[in-house]
């Protein structure tokens, strides 16, 4: 069977439109349903409050949308790490990690050593906290549509207008 150019172009156009719809789903910043429970989301919001004190009002929606786009392996790692951190929190403070204050959460993360280790997905609890929780929350918050503008670095050096905005010459 021979395919004509027209049939090939129609097939290519159909495949591209399906691929484009899939890419649109992956980049949907408004998705709010996610695989985490309320306790899990509270844990991630506590991490957000610790590592990014100027977290925006839409932090919960942004983090939920980010977690909803993760693959199953990453979500399992995130949930397992949150569960272990939660049990550690209950042992030290008698409350879940999501219920801790910012100061208590900081102390707990420092106690397990999350502020002194490299991130590894399969390492110690501190390395996994750094990889699955801290890095994921920072990535979600800093790559949202508003980006880094709330931090005063909206146009980094190397991008058009970057040097002028970086040096305050605008």
What are these model-predicted stretches?
Residues 46, 61-170:
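Mature-region segments of soluble proteins
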Residues 28, 40, 55-58, 62, ...:
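Residue-level signal for well-ordered alpha-helical segments
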Residues 1-2, 33-35, 93-100:
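Short, exposed beta-strand "edge-strand" segments with a Pro/Gly-rich flavor and a Y/T-containing core
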Residues 3-7, 12, 16-55:
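C-terminal segment of N-terminal export signals and the immediately downstream linker at the start
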